[in-house]
Amino acid sequence: NTSLMPASSGTVNVSYWDREYVSIPKLLKEQGYYAFSMHGNNGSMWNRLNMHKSLGYDKFYNYKNDFKIDETFGLGLSDKSFFRQAVPKIKKISEEHQNFYGTMIMLTNHTPWDDADKLDETLDLTMKYEEVNEETGETETKTASYLEGTTIGNYLKSVHYADAAIGQFIEDLDA
């Protein structure tokens, strides 16, 4: 939102949230836009409640205050639940404001990916390969659980899930 370089120590959101920033939300507000942000975690995480005000957002929707915690993944609300609950809020915003700008902060792709087994999207991480049977000379298809249960495998499952969640979100906004 600002194209700022990170702080040399600490974090901008915690150490420098009270500064004056040139940001996309502020620039768009000068053009008559309403700006909002939403996150499936609480507003105190990375001091977003204060920082988003400094960035010029009119409203910050967050985990504990604005969403029903009905499905968690990792650090907070699952992306599918987050988007499902965000759609009516965004539709209401679009009825009240001709021009608006929104930032949606997802959580599923955030480490750790230990909850990958909770995801309802299936991604086959099985490696398939062919091998010639020495006794018969025939080619056989074999499988191995190549990435199942690994960090990279869990990450790929979370990306697959997030992709499906974004697709459903877009469909729901269009409905």
Predicted regions and their residues:
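Solvent-exposed soluble domains appended to multi-pass membrane proteins
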Residues: 1-175
